[in-house]
Amino acid sequence: MSIFKEYRDYDGIGLVELIKSKQISPLDPLDSAIDLIERLDPKLNCVHRKLYHDATESLNRNKNLEGVFAGIPMLLKDMDSSLANHPMMQGSSYLKNTTMPYDNILTKKFRKTGALICGKSATPEYGLMITTEPVKFGPTRNPWDTNKTTGGSSGGSAAAVAA
């Protein structure tokens, strides 16, 4: 695993420029994102499904790095974004056995950009709570103050970005 220490200093466009100019390898951003998730998520609880193998396979299939975000890792919100052969739980244990047979339009568009879906972010049950504290997974913590939770249906995404 190759960790790109300055990963957090760049946005997606900046990372794409580094990849295209061969200053970093296409695998560096993904390895760095995985490292951050593994180090920070036990404390934050913002990623409820890790899809590292899928992301690596997507990168291997896109050797030509096609798409404006080719090689850039991302989290997919686990709410109304179906991902083929994976559950879409929407923060609920009720849907734990609901495997989606297809990528929905939004997921297909993300894939077309070349982005690598490396996980699904935490959401409150069905997006109906003002904080991200689903019974199934437990609360998502604010990275700036872990005594607090994150709010809204994008709490997992918000915590991941803020971390």
Residue ranges of predicted features:
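Gly/Ser-rich catalytic/binding loops embedded in alpha/beta enzyme cores
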Residues: S2-A163
